[in-house]
């Protein structure tokens, strides 16, 4: 079931959240689906609900990372599905009034997954990053946060 507002208030009174980071979508993506409007609407509802439950907490929606598949004997970004889903997530974040972080671009954009696999930072399914890749992305994420905080004078 959904998180009730009452339960969220109880939880927040015990351990208040400074930030909530959401990351969804990798397994939703398929090469055949290029329209993620219903996904974006549902994600907007989820984020708005969290905003209601935790009104003083910053919320960041991490976009989907790169995902590759084999085409003509070589692994390549699952075009244009990755970009379509990432844009749907960006729209959902904008609509819900939260920050969007572009994981796909942070991974290097088109064919970024190839670099992750080559460096042992993603599984050979060319879909899922591993702990080493997560550490690399986390470093980029923190750099982005620090940059924005400095830019905003926080």
Q: PLM ranges: what are they?
A:
Residues 7, 14, 30, 60, ...:
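Extended interaction regions within the primary functional domain
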Residues 35, 49, 56, 110, ...:
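Histidine (H) residue identity feature
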Residues 66-154:
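Catalytic His-Asp segment of secreted/periplasmic serine-dependent ester chemistry enzymes
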Residues 18-23, 58-63, 99-103, 128:
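Structural recognition of the beta-strand scaffold that forms the well-ordered cores
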Residues 43-48, 86, 90:
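Generic structural signal for well-ordered alpha-helices
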Residues 23-27, 49-84:
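Active-site segments of SGNH/GDSL-like serine hydrolases
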Residues 1-42, 52, 70, 128:
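Conserved SGNH/GDSL esterase-like catalytic core that processes O-acyl groups on lipids
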Residues 10-17, 55-56, 102-109:
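Short, functional N-terminal and low-complexity linear motifs
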């Amino acid at each position: 079931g959904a998180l009730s507002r009452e339960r969220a208030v109880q939880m927040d009174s015990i351990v208040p959240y400074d930030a909530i980071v959401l990351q969804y979508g990798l397994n939703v993506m398929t090469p055949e689906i290029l329209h993620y409007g219903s996904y974006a609407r549902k994600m907007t509802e989820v984020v708005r609900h969290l905003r209601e439950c935790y009104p003083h907490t910053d919320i960041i929606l991490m976009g989907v990372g790169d995902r590759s598949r084999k085409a003509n004997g070589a692994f390549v970004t699952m075009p244009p599905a990755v970009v379509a889903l990432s844009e749907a997530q960006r729209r959902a974040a904008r609509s819900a009034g939260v920050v969007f972080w572009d994981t796909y671009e942070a991974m290097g954009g088109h064919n970024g997954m190839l670099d992750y696999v080559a460096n042992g930072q993603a599984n050979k399914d060319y879909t899922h990053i591993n702990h080493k890749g997560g550490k690399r992305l986390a470093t980029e994420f923190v750099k982005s946060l620090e940059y924005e905080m400095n830019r905003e004078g926080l």
